[in-house]
Amino acid sequence: SAPLAAYLRERGEILMVSGFTDDRPMRGGGGNARFADNWELSAQRALTVTRALVDEGIPSAQVFAAAFGAEQAVASNADAEGRARNRRVEMAPMPRPARRAQP
């Protein structure tokens, strides 16, 4: 995590951790009832990785979580293999937002 933190700091970037799901709707009871829908599940995926990075020493100001639900599929959801590929977390460096001047 130290090399990642140094990389982000040197480049003036922050890390976006994005969570995704397949297109199967969440079902109460039979499926994973902890999440209301795919948006919530994808948010939890991203937050789990974000928290692990912070626990490993990445400053919390250098990382954020984003949820995409079933949007932006990388494979067809028509079969189990494609759905498995769509259930993922991605990480990408992003430009750090400009700081606003204090009034």
Residue ranges of predicted features:
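Short beta-strand/loop motifs in extracellular/secreted proteins, especially
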Residues: 13
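Periplasmic OmpA-like peptidoglycan-binding domain that tethers envelope proteins to the cell wall
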Residues: 1-3, 7-10, 20-103
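Histidine/lysine/aspartate-rich catalytic loop segments that bind and position anionic ligands
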Residues: 16
